[in-house]
């Protein structure tokens, strides 16, 4: 079984995880297709992953022992058996189309067939909370670079270079934009609505983030404050650092939202602050799972002063008790020796005091 080169895996992963911005309360369905040529190892490897909102629900891999479109979400068990046969055939047909596309791109770019190349597409549709269509897209890439894309109006194409203009002319003559627009505005929306109904307990839930702020000294003069949001769903979230109530957008390092591995997501935002001014900075967290936005600050660890005072007081108390015991013993000894004359302290008396000192920590 051949393997996808690391660079291509990163491209595929970037496509799957760099989620397109969506409107609050909206839903989306997205597919990512990747074909990778591997000279001398047979047919190109072809992979499909499909997402509803931020949940992967189907996958196809031509390198599987028995290549079939596979279920990736529990709620997909509700579809009829013939669904999987139909989707598997579509995937296999598309794999052959992409094989041809790879060969065509080699000619357009005047490249040798000896190297490995990739051809990818991502497409999808988005609907409002009430199910109405409001956005669709379809984009293609070759060897990790933009190739051609359907414009926002879904009626025309934009080619990234002169090689892609060959494809643009061919597709314009064949009316490909109209065919894709019909799919995105109607069939894609119908399937998305159906999937949302089947998986509503998962897809339409709102898990609030668990948020906190960590402190990382960078130097004697500066420290990094990092605001964490963990375990939230859906993926849409806002993390904003403020200084004295003013947004610090330009000075904030913000990572892309990442899967947490358990069906939820993670994200953090960091800002570098002058040491000693940490309390002037607050992190504002907004997510649909929260009844109201969270406002967080860094909480310095509790100072050990109280603990030290308690230890010192305890030691002093022990010394006072020992001193009182020694005084009582001496008085009793003095009384017993008084019958025969003056009391003379024993030679080892100061060693008792020395023994008392040894109890000090």
Swiss-Prot record:
Any transmembrane segments, and where? 309-329
Q: Would you indicate the residue range of the signal peptide?
A: 1-24
Q: Any idea which UniProt keywords this protein has? A: Disulfide bond, Glycoprotein, Immunity, Membrane, MHC I, Phosphoprotein, Signal, Transmembrane, Transmembrane helix
User: What Pfam families would the database entry show?
Assistant: C1-set, MHC_I, MHC_I_C
Where is the protein found, in the record's own terms?
A: Membrane
The Ig-like C1-type domain is annotated at 209-297
Mapped to this chain, the residue ranges on the Cytoplasmic side of the membrane are 330-361
Q: What family is it from?
A: Belongs to the MHC class I family.
What is this protein's function? Involved in the presentation of foreign antigens to the immune system.
This chain's protein is named RLA class I histocompatibility antigen, alpha chain 19-1
């Amino acid at each position: 079984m051949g393997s996808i080169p690391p660079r291509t895996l990163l491209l595929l992963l970037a496509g799957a995880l760099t989620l397109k911005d969506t409107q609050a309360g909206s839903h989306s369905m997205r597919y990512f297709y990747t074909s990778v040529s591997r000279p001398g190892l047979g047919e190109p490897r072809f992979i499909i992953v499909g997402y509803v909102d931020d949940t992967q629900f189907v996958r196809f891999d031509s390198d599987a022992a028995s290549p079939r479109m596979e279920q990736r979400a529990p709620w997909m068990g509700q579809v009829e058996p013939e669904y999987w046969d139909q989707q598997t055939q579509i995937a296999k047909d598309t794999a052959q189309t992409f094989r041809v596309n790879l060969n065509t791109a080699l000619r357009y770019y005047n490249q040798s067939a000896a190297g490995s190349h990739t051809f990818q597409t991502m497409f999808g549709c988005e609907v409002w909370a009430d199910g109405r269509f409001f956005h669709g897209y379809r984009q293609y890439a070759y060897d990790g670079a933009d190739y051609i894309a359907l414009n926002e109006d879904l009626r025309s194409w934009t080619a990234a270079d002169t090689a892609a203009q060959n494809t643009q002319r061919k597709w314009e003559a064949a009316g490909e934009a109209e065919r894709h627009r019909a799919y995105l505005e109607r069939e894609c929306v119908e399937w998305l609505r159906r999937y949302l109904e089947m998986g509503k307990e998962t897809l339409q839930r709102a898990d609030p983030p668990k948020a906190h702020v960590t402190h990382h000294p960078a130097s004697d003069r500066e420290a990094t404050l990092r605001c964490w949001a963990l375990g939230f769903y859906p993926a849409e979230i806002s993390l904003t650092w403020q200084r004295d109530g003013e947004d610090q957008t330009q000075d904030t390092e913000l990572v892309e939202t990442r899967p947490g591995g358990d069906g939820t997501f993670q994200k953090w935002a960091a800002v570098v602050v002058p040491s000693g001014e940490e309390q002037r900075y607050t992190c504002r967290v907004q997510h649909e799972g929260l009844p109201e936005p969270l406002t967080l600050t860094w909480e310095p660890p509790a100072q050990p002063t109280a603990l030290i005072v308690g230890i010192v007081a305890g030691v002093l108390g022990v010394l006072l008790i020992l001193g009182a015991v020694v005084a009582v013993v001496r008085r009793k000894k003095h009384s017993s020796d008084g019958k025969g004359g003056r009391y003379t302290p024993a030679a080892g008396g100061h060693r008792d005091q020395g023994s008392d000192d040894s109890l000090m920590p």
